[in-house]
Regions:
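Short, glycine-/Ser/Thr-/acidic-enriched flexible segments
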Residues: 2, 8-12, 48, 114, ...
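C-terminal catalytic lobe of FAD-dependent flavoproteins
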Residues: 69-163, 171
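Long, compositionally biased
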Residues: 2-8, 220-228
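Immediate flanking context of iron-sulfur cluster ligation sites
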Residues: 164-176, 194-213
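Local cysteine-cluster metal-coordination motifs and their immediate loop/turn environment
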Residues: 175-191, 206-226
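Cysteine/selenocysteine-centered motifs that mediate thiol-based redox chemistry or coordinate metal-sulfur cofactors
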Residues: 18-50, 154-188
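Long, contiguous, secondary-structure-rich segments that constitute the structural scaffold
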Residues: 2-104, 108-112
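Catalytic cores of large soluble enzymes that bind and process phosphate-bearing ligands
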Residues: 35, 52, 59-61, 82-85, ...
Length: 228
């Protein structure tokens, strides 16, 4: 099989993103380019104790977090997080990571039995950062939460729904984004597959455009088709 890894990432976007150091030192004698950017690798599953994500206006404090990857969201930065060690005090851990100050509003929810923790920092009425953590990987979709960063001030409905991670307005939750190029979510893809509207990679591209851009989501689309 093949493993795709973004080769131009650096320490700004990931905790261990400098993968070029692993590339074989076999280069073209003229251009100096590596051997078609090809290197044999061996991979194994990462056995994490928890995983989650944080949305922040600025930078997240990532020191001590075993796995983190940063990407640009809607008026915020999105961090995907995981670690093999469960913090002893989630509230203290989150306050440090999200940059809590005395004047800030702090919302949080914790269910120790299921290993879920959620927190949000509100500053001067607007959402400054939020954190969602789960032991089993069951996390809310990011889209609606990201949209809150565009609001100059959170209304009462948004505040009440914030830690639920779900919009108070009824609508289809398309799930975690699979195709970044066209913002197509997992739930939307599964719906098209289970209803028989997109049973091939080509059909998915025609109906939802997923997989017709950069192509990096094609392996995940194939897995959804195989399991659908």
């Amino acid at each position: 099989g093949t493993v795709f890894v973004p080769m131009h990432w650096n320490d700004v976007f990931a905790g261990n993103g400098r993968v070029d150091a692993l590339v074989n030192p076999v280069v073209d004698p003229i251009s100096g380019e590596p051997e078609f950017k090809h290197t044999p690798v061996r991979i194994s599953a990462y056995a994490c104790a928890w995983q989650g994500f944080a949305l922040v206006r600025g930078d997240l404090e990532t020191d001590g977090v075993a796995y983190w990857v940063r990407s640009t969201g809607t008026r915020c930065s999105r961090y995907e997080l995981a670690d093999t060690v469960m913090p002893g005090d989630w509230s203290a851990w989150a306050m440090i990571r999200l940059g809590h100050a005395e004047a800030d509003e702090w919302l949080e929810f914790q269910d120790a039995g299921t290993g879920r923790y959620r927190a949000a920092l509100i500053r001067a009425g607007r959402l400054e950062s939020c954190l969602f953590v789960s032991r089993d990987g069951n996390l809310p979709a990011r889209q609606w939460l990201e949209s809150l960063f565009a609001a100059p001030e959170l209304d009462s409905a948004a505040r009440m729904s914030l830690l639920a991670g779900r919009s108070p307005v009824a609508g289809e939750d398309q799930g975690e984004i699979v195709c970044s190029c066209f913002q197509v979510g997992r739930n939307r893809l599964l719906k098209a597959i289970t209803q028989g509207e997109a049973l091939t990679l080509e059909a998915i591209g025609q109906k939802l455009q997923a997989g017709t851009g950069c192509g990096s989501c094609v392996p995940e689309l194939k897995r959804l088709l195989a399991n659908g």
